[in-house]
């Protein structure tokens, strides 16, 4: 599974974003992380495009790395209070993951954490969403899984949320990231690939062949980007690698083993 519509670009995807904004609902929750979105000017552009289309915009900022369950509930309250009919997530994996669960929680009369971990039931209705990706590596826009930290329970666990109806992946939007964060994202992509690759069955199959190609490309393009941070092609390839690692293509015919991620979740909680 993957977003219904995906737009890949090496330069700013303004036209694609505007086309998608023409299709969305009237009341929009604009979700993002810290101040960098405003500092780069992207926030003002998106606000302007939404207002040009007569949309009512509600801010949902301050989504932290490793988003908390409290932040999810804050977003759900905003959606209910302002009758939000579309969630626009702008950011990296944390923003994108948080909104997946917000989208699901709003449609439920019960606590989504208890629903999934006590009753082992999963949501089936969601508020529509779109994503503008500003950091590659997590591939979060490609699936409906989210990792949320429950501070009260001291747990960091996966939750099932919504799929995005569209995703804008433009490598130009990652140019403002520190190189250290770009490198970390590439290693996250490698970890996704490896944890799929090492999973059963360990027999020859096409998924493994594609996986090997993606891993080779991550290593090659990351080296190129470190040597030349202005290499837009290498930057775009890393974003494409990130998407391929998490859009389920590499998981076909595999019993994935994400124990390295699970160990990190336990430590990170």
Please report, for each region that a protein language model flagged, where it lies by residue:
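ATP/NTP phosphate-donor binding region
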Residues: 1-86
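Short, intrinsically disordered, charge-balanced linker/junction segments flanking boundaries
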Residues: 2, 156-160, 266-269
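Short, well-ordered alpha-helices that flank and scaffold nucleotide-derived cofactor binding pockets
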Residues: 19, 48, 77, 104, ...
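Glycine/threonine-rich beta-strand-loop-alpha-helix active-site module
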Residues: 70-172
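Buried hydrophobic packing segments
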Residues: 75, 98-103, 193-194, 218-221, ...
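Carboxylate- and glycine-rich phosphate/diphosphate-binding segment that chelates Mg2+/Mn2+
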Residues: 145-255
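C-terminal catalytic subdomain
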Residues: 254-269
């Amino acid at each position: 599974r993957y977003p219904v519509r995906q737009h890949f670009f090496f330069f700013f995807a303004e036209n694609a974003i505007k086309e998608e904004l023409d299709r969305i609902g009237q009341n929009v929750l604009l979700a993002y992380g810290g101040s960098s979105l405003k500092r780069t000017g992207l926030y003002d552009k998106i606000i302007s495009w939404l207002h040009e289309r007569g949309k009512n915009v509600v801010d949902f900022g301050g989504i932290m790395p490793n988003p908390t369950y409290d932040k999810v509930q804050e977003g759900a309250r905003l959606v209910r209070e302002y009758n939000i009919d579309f969630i626009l997530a702008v950011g990296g994996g944390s923003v994108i993951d948080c909104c997946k669960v917000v989208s699901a929680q709003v449609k439920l009369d019960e606590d989504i954490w208890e629903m999934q971990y006590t009753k082992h039931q999963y949501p089936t209705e969601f508020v529509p969403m779109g994503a503008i990706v500003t950091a590659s590596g997590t591939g979060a826009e490609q699936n409906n899984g989210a990792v949320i930290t429950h501070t009260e329970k001291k747990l960091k666990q996966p939750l099932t949320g919504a799929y995005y109806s569209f995703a804008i992946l433009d490598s130009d939007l990652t140019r403002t990231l520190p190189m250290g964060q770009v490198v970390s994202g590439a290693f996250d992509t490698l970890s996704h690939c490896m944890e799929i690759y090492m999973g059963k069955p360990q027999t020859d199959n096409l998924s493994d062949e594609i996986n090997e190609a993606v891993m080779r490309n991550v290593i090659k393009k990351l080296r190129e980007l470190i040597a030349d941070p202005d290499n837009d092609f290498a930057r775009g390839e890393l974003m494409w690698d990130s998407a391929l690692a998490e859009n389920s293509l590499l998981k076909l015919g595999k019993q994935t083993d994400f124990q390295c991620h699970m160990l990190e979740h336990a430590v990170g909680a």
